[in-house]
């Protein structure tokens, strides 16, 4: 009898776990959607019912074998499973209070960000070379694996590297600092090298499939814009570049919404060479224009300080005040600057 009660309790727990978080698109079969149509959705990159519910109708119609009538039925059933209506600000405030923040490794930087890098949104870091963008990414790839009470996200990290600057040795140094097993830390980081803008976008489809299978806390794209500077050149291709970049950023935002992962992207800067630059205190601005500015939830501007110290400024945020903090790049990752 006791054994039976234990089994029932375990079954209840597994049901609870299943109903929490993003649900696989295969659940649509229970709502009367044909298994072949579900397979077509998966092949097109829709791996969760949330991905289907958030998609515009024309995106589903573009899938080979999905007619307008089928698209309507799929969207209707997905909308029943995913809550997408109005909610009170009280309920939303409650959900916001449960958001996990991942430590950057520096207490001063965490204080500036009111806890750390926020999950479920896009954080953009931009600055010149040697300002610490990649070093923060490497540190976050380890700290996201820490328990929540130690400032982590209790999940794996995904790292898309477009500049060839990923170094596993740095992860091992940070892991040692936090007392984590080096081999476990490396096993929990999924790494991919992006070779062009189309490949970079294709990797996000793979990322979506992997996130359904396993718990990921962080997705890093370092750098999100480097390949756009080389694949598209001149003003003639500016419109095409911005449209492609907008689609890429929209996919990132969708992954943040669907899976609640922290998305961290790095961006490069460009020197302003027009007449106004003469009067600007700092004649450098992030590339990508308004497209990337609107897609990022929080924008951090990094610049060099003295020696190994770096300065981080809140450039844009919906809730953080404009302020600065100093941090240092140490042998064991990002830390506090020594006075």
From Swiss-Prot:
Principal localisation: nucleus
Stretch list, region Disordered: 1-24
Biological process terms in GO annotation: cellular response to camptothecin; cellular response to ionizing radiation; chromosome organization involved in meiotic cell cycle; DNA damage response; DNA recombinase assembly; DNA strand invasion; double-strand break repair via homologous recombination; interstrand cross-link repair
Keywords associated with the record: Acetylation, ATP-binding, Chromosome, Cytoplasm, Cytoskeleton, DNA damage, DNA recombination, DNA repair, DNA-binding, Isopeptide bond, Mitochondrion, Nucleotide-binding, Nucleus, Phosphoprotein, Ubl conjugation
Family matches, as CDD domains: Rad51
SUPFAM superfamilies membership: P-loop containing nucleoside triphosphate hydrolases (SSF52540), Rad51 N-terminal domain-like (SSF47794)
Quaternary structure and partners: Forms linear homooligomers, giving rise to a RAD51 nucleoprotein filament, which is essential for strand-pairing reactions during DNA recombination. Interacts with BRCA1 and either directly or indirectly with p53. Interacts with XRCC3, RAD54L and RAD54B. Interacts with the BCDX2 subcomplex RAD51C:RAD51B. Component of the homologous recombination repair (HR) complex composed of ERCC5/XPG, BRCA2, PALB2, DSS1 and RAD51. Interacts directly with PALB2 which may serve as a scaffold for a HR complex containing PALB2, BRCA2, RAD51C, RAD51 and XRCC3. Interacts with RAD51AP1 and RAD51AP2.
Primary role: Plays an important role in homologous strand exchange, a key step in DNA repair through homologous recombination (HR). Binds to single-stranded DNA in an ATP-dependent manner to form nucleoprotein filaments which are essential for the homology search and strand exchange. Catalyzes the recognition of homology and strand exchange between homologous DNA partners to form a joint molecule between a processed DNA break and the repair template. Recruited to resolve stalled replication forks during replication stress.
Annotated protein name in UniProt: DNA repair protein RAD51 homolog 1
Originating organism: Oryctolagus cuniculus (Rabbit)
């Amino acid at each position: 009898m006791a054994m039976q009660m234990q089994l029932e309790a375990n079954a209840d727990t597994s049901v609870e776990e299943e109903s929490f978080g993003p649900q696989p698109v295969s659940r649509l079969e229970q709502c009367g959607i044909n298994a072949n149509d579900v397979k077509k959705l998966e092949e097109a990159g829709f791996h969760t019912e949330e991905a289907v519910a958030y998609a515009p109708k024309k995106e589903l119609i573009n899938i080979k074998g999905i007619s307008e009538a089928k698209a309507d039925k799929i969207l209707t059933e997905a909308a029943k499973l995913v809550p997408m209506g109005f909610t009170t600000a009280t309920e939303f405030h409650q959900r916001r209070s449960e958001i996990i923040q991942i430590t950057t490794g520096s207490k001063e930087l965490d204080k500036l960000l009111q806890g750390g890098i926020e999950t479920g949104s896009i954080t953009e870091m931009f600055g010149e070379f040697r300002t610490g963008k990649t070093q923060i990414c490497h540190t976050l790839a380890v700290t996201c694996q820490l328990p929540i009470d130690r400032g982590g996200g209790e999940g794996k990290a995904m790292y898309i590297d477009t500049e060839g600057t990923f170094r596993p040795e740095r992860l091992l140094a940070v892991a040692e600092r936090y007392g984590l097993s080096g081999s476990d830390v490396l096993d929990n980081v999924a790494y991919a090298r992006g070779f062009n803008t189309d490949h970079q976008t294709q990797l996000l489809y793979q990322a979506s499939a992997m996130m359904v299978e396993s718990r990921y806390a962080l997705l890093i794209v370092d750098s999100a814009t480097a390949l756009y500077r080389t694949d598209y050149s001149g003003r003639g291709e500016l419109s095409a570049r911005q449209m492609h970049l907008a689609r890429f950023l929209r996919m990132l935002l969708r992954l943040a919404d669907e899976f609640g992962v922290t998305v961290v992207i790095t961006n490069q800067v460009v020197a302003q060479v027009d007449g106004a630059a003469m009067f600007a205190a700092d004649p450098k601005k992030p590339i990508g224009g308004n497209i990337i500015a609107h897609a990022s939830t929080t924008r951090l501007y990094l610049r060099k300080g003295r020696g190994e110290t770096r300065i981080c400024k809140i450039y844009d945020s919906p809730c953080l005040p404009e302020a600065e903090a100093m941090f240092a790049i140490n042998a064991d990752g990002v830390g506090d600057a020594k006075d």
